[in-house]
Amino acid sequence: MFSSFFGNTCSWVFIFIIIVDNEAFLHFSCLIFVFINIFVFLRGVKDIFSFFFLTRRFSFIVVIYYFFLVPRDQLRISRLFHKRQILCKDSRQLMTCSLGLFFKAQINIFLPPFALTVVQFLVNLVCHT
C-alpha cells in the first residue's frame, strides 16, 4: 500500500520537476535514489518487489526525460556520487552512461565496495571513450 502510494507520488513529482527545472530534477532524483535504498534496507528483502516496481517506473521517466526533453548535441548529467560532470557525445552514449549510473545507484547497498569500484570503472570507461 505504502509502496504503491510512494511510487505514484514520486512519478508525479518527477514529471513536475522535469517540466519546471532540469537541474532540480537531477538533484531530486539523487535524493530519491538514496531514500529508496534506505527504505528497502529498512523494510528487508520481503519488500524487494515493490522496490523493483519503483525503479522500473523511475527508469521509464528517465528515458522520457533524456530522449525528449534534453538537447541532443551535448548532454550533461550529474554523477550520483561525485560533483564532477561528464559530457556525453550523443544520445546513445548518454543513455549508456545514465543506465550505468542508475545501475550503480541501485546496487550500492547490496554489493561490497570492491564491486562498486568495478562498476564505477566501467561507467567511466564507457562515458569517456
Curated annotation (Swiss-Prot):
It is a multi-pass membrane protein. Partially overlaps SPT6. It comes from the Eukaryota. One of its GO terms (cellular component) is membrane. It is found in: Membrane. The keyword Transmembrane helix applies. This is Putative uncharacterized protein YGR114C. Coiled coil: none annotated. The chain crosses the membrane at residues 15-35, 48-68, 107-127. Keywords: Membrane, Transmembrane, Transmembrane helix. Its main location: membrane. The lineage of its organism: Eukaryota, Fungi, Dikarya, Ascomycota, Saccharomycotina. The keyword Membrane applies.
